[in-house]
Amino acid sequence: MFRLIKKIKDNGRWRIFKLKLIDARLYFVSIFVGLLTGLVAVPYHYLLQFFFNLRHDFFDSHPKWYWYIPLFLLMWGILVFVSWLVKKMPLITGGGIPQTRGVINGRVDYKHPFLELVAKFVGGILALSTGLSLGREGPSVQIGSYVGYLVSKWGRVLSGERKQLLYAGAGAGLAAAFAAPLASSLLVIESIERFDAPKTAITTLLAGVVAGGVASWIFPINPYFHIDAIVPGMTFWGQVKLFLLLAAVVSVFGKFFSVTTLQMKRIYPAIKHPEYVKMLYLLFIAFLISMAEFNLTGGGEQFLLSQAMHPDTHILWIVGMMLLHFVFSTFSFSSGLPGGSFIPTLVTGGLLGQIVGLIMVQQGVIAYENISYIMLICMSAFLVAVIRTPLTAIVLITEITGHLEVFYPSIVVGGLTYYFTEMLQIKPFNVILYDDMIHSPAFKEEPRYTLSVEVMSGSYLDGKIVDELRLPERCVIINVHRDRKNWPPKGQKLMPGDQVQIEMDSQDIEKLYEPLVSMANIY
């Protein structure tokens, strides 16, 4: 028996077996991260819905005018408090996807992860409870990344495993927000990791399925399932013309949406008023919209759902509501308060599709019952135009609605939209936010940065001698971590499971991160 074990150890099978055990442990911990993320992100969603209903009941009761004053003052105080939280903890600002990518890349670090998690949770709920047009998905992604980070700290895992748990938590956060585990895994790959590694796909899927299961248990009724998607009876060339039209309209408005929102986000800090005065302006707009069309507040998701189920509305009214929602979302997002842009983007795309559908009904091309079909395709395509994550956009709409009828049209329109947005030179929204974050005055950059990559079996680095590797200029391998020990790099032959630490200039992180990580991975 002992001779057999010694023989296994000598021919390397023992090491492979240990690596498989380490992977199994990582997958098990990913499931745990998904469960914890679901237990945090789902209550986040529940409380957002609770406060939305509370506000709805208040405004729907049409109280005497003097009852609005204490509510207005209370919400003003809430926004001032949340803006103070953001000032104290800058990483909780906005949606959270760029911040999550920054932590994974090593640009920033969660210095006080538990406090920041609580601040993001509380700040996001309070900001959206006032009616601002913000989304829940970005904060859910960052909440999940905080959970993954904390579990990695408590579990004392390696730096490579920590990144996988961050990926798992981020994916689980989106899965908890939409009950869409497959789309959540794709979002991590397309928007955060930005290339496909098998281990990342597995960890995010495992965590996403668990978190999505928790979300489905708490929210068993998915309102998107009630949207009908009736395919219009059109010829092949009629469908081609329709898809080209939708892609062109979505691409042009996507360009306008991205440019306007980002310009407003840069103009907002330059407004020479105290922060509490800016919050007063923002709340005043939210109050007016709450009294005029309540469902447009809180991101506008309820308004989108009502229009998708009953799309036969006057076209001029929908145009006005879409423009109002767009302006309100732009102001809300530019404030920097905790809240994402994912749902406002979906709503804008859906309403744009409704406008196109109503025009086509007037021209006798389609019937009213086909408008929801157009809306779902435009929701997917608008995500492609703004965020540039085609796989996520296509799968998400199919997954949350359950309509396979829109899957193939979304692929065609999404592909055309991607091509048109490249022609229009629209940079991905989250990439611009990430660049703004790392170049902001508040960002402190260390001169050198250490990247840790795990060597996968069959990758380019597998079997290579460290001294023979030709790395980019000013990149140097400083350490090889193997079997829980640190080994000097000189003369080391790299093996699967090795954690290779590469030091580089901080200014080169974005340029070299993906090439260096891809050298250690297989596809």
Predicted regions mapped to residue ranges:
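Cytosolic Rossmann-like ligand/nucleotide-binding regulatory domains
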Residues: 457, 462-508, 512
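Short, compositionally biased
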Residues: 512-523
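Alpha-helical transmembrane segments and immediately membrane-proximal extracytoplasmic
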Residues: 1-441, 447-449, 456-457, 481-484, ...
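Short, solvent-exposed beta-strand edge segments and adjacent coil->beta transition regions
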Residues: 448-452, 497-499
